[in-house]
């Protein structure tokens, strides 16, 4: 899930974003 992905439903988006945060940090 990416922050600019507006079409996903919010609960799963938030869940996926929180899960991927460390990976996004490592990959920036």
Swiss-Prot record:
List S-S links within the chain.
none
Where do the TM regions start and end?
none
Keyword Transmembrane applies:
no
Query: Is Nucleus set as a keyword in this record?
Result: yes
Q: Name one GO molecular function term.
A: GTP binding
BP-aspect Gene Ontology terms: protein transport
Q: Name one GO cellular component term.
A: nucleus
Entry's localization field: Nucleus
Q: Which UniProt keywords apply?
A: GTP-binding, Nucleotide-binding, Nucleus, Protein transport, Transport
From what superkingdom does this record's organism come?
Eukaryota
Q: How does it assemble?
A: Found in a nuclear export complex with RanGTP, exportin and pre-miRNA.
Q: What does this protein do?
A: GTP-binding protein involved in nucleocytoplasmic transport. Required for the import of protein into the nucleus and also for RNA export. Involved in chromatin condensation and control of cell cycle.
What does the similarity note say? Answer: Belongs to the small GTPase superfamily. Ran family.
Name this protein carries in UniProt: GTP-binding nuclear protein Ran
Q: Which organism is it from?
A: Populus euphratica (Euphrates poplar)
